[in-house]
Amino acid sequence: MGNLHTSIAVASICLTSAFLGCVFGLGFFVWIIYGYSIGGFFAFLSLFHLLEFYITARFQGSQLSWDSFILNNGKAYWLAMLVGLLECLLSGGKSFAKVINCLRFPSFLINFIFSVYQTSALGFLCLGQYLRSSAMVQAGQSFSHIVASKRNKDHLLVTDGIYAYVRHPSYVGFFIWALGTQMLLGNFVSTLLFSLVLWKFFSQRITTEEAYLVSFFGDSYEQYRKKVPSGIPLIP
């Protein structure tokens, strides 16, 4: 959106923050008071985008712009979220439960499995957000929402903290968080589709990004890659 230090850019950021804050508050209220999971979905979704901007402002200030909300995350991102919402609305939030019902389990077991599924959704959302935010904070100026094709002077190879356990904690975090959004909605089909599409996306992105990282850091990155997993299943 151009230079951050213009009245239009600042106004846009203020309005976007206010809008996301309202969505979070309303969604959280509907979720907690009325028990509608769709409210929780919007609360976690708006919080994610608010934190993307806040952490960028706090730890990657030189990169800050309206784009840091990553609301322009591509048509595929919003289409996927829309499909998830439609599945939830059409199934009454019981898509997963209906699939389990087809297995002819006893009703108490079906209720238990569905309860575990939705409880796991909260775990996925919180864990995913934690990993994503922690990765951005620990990487500092070395973090970027866009794959860097050229090394900047502030770009360092971060191998400690959360990066000592997985090479791409921000991707792992987003992967887990995105699955959590669909699990919270009680979706079955969208959860599977998200898993497949995100795996393919990150497989390609990691391959591209690591080619650049090897060119930036040479053998240091090669050795790091041998010792630490990517964090996403079936992606070495």
UniProtKB/Swiss-Prot annotation:
It is a multi-pass membrane protein. The keyword Transmembrane applies. PROSITE patterns: SAM_ICMT. PANTHER family: PROTEIN-S ISOPRENYLCYSTEINE O-METHYLTRANSFERASE (PTHR12714), PROTEIN-S-ISOPRENYLCYSTEINE O-METHYLTRANSFERASE (PTHR12714:SF9). Its EC number is 2.1.1.100. Keywords: Membrane, Methyltransferase, Pheromone response, S-adenosyl-L-methionine, Transferase, Transmembrane, Transmembrane helix. Its main location: membrane. GO terms for biological process: methylation; peptide mating pheromone maturation involved in positive regulation of conjugation with cellular fusion; peptide pheromone maturation; response to pheromone. Disulfide bonds: none annotated. It is found in: Membrane. One of its GO terms (cellular component) is endoplasmic reticulum. The keyword Methyltransferase applies. Mediates C-terminal methylation of the isoprenylated C-terminal cysteine in M-factor. This is Protein-S-isoprenylcysteine O-methyltransferase. It is an enzyme of class 2 (transferase). InterPro entries: ICMT_MeTrfase, PPMT_MeTrfase. S-adenosyl-L-methionine binds at residues 155-158, 163, 168-171, 209. GO terms for molecular function: protein C-terminal S-isoprenylcysteine carboxyl O-methyltransferase activity. Gene3D superfamilies: 1.20.120.1630. Belongs to the class VI-like SAM-binding methyltransferase superfamily. Isoprenylcysteine carboxyl methyltransferase family. Substrate binds at residue 205. The chain crosses the membrane at residues 3-23, 24-44, 76-96, 108-128, 174-194. It catalyses: [protein]-C-terminal S-[(2E,6E)-farnesyl]-L-cysteine + S-adenosyl-L-methionine = [protein]-C-terminal S-[(2E,6E)-farnesyl]-L-cysteine methyl ester + S-adenosyl-L-homocysteine. It holds the Pfam family ICMT.
